A protein has these predicted regions:
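Non-catalytic terminal and connector segments of soluble metabolic enzymes
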Residues: 1-120
Length: 120
């Protein structure tokens, strides 16, 4: 788990969007993410990626369901209000990019043994 407020510099932005380098919208993505501070979050838990993506809603705001972050607050796809990793490999890469080891914390909640199924 981790949380921090970040003013993203161009280098970090370009590394974050590296998979879009060379595409016509790359510079717009970089310019937008460096335009203001953002909150970087790292979640952990059962199905964390799927849960966060469901809370975020569809990438295109007009396709996002009401009650999701994008459905309620996003206006345009290019200036996306929220990002979530699309799978475990991307999550590992993005965690390394956005957080140092001392910024991530692990803990066990006592209630977890009562509400979470044991791992198989």
């Amino acid at each position: 788990m981790g949380l921090k407020l970040v003013q993203v510099d161009r280098d970090l932005a370009e590394r974050h969007y590296d998979s879009h380098r060379g595409k016509p919208f790359f510079e717009g993505l970089v310019d937008f993410i460096i335009s203001a501070p953002l909150v970087a979050l790292a979640f952990d838990g059962p199905n964390a990626i799927a849960v966060v993506r469901a809370i975020n809603g569809a990438t295109r705001p007009h396709e996002a369901a009401p009650g999701t972050i994008r459905g309620d607050f996003a206006l345009e796809t290019a200036q996306n209000i929220v990002h979530a990793s699309d799978g475990p490999e991307a999550a590992a890469t993005e965690l390394d990019l956005w957080f140092s080891a001392d910024e991530l914390h692990e803990y066990e909640r006592d209630v977890d043994r009562w509400v979470l199924a044991p791992e198989e």
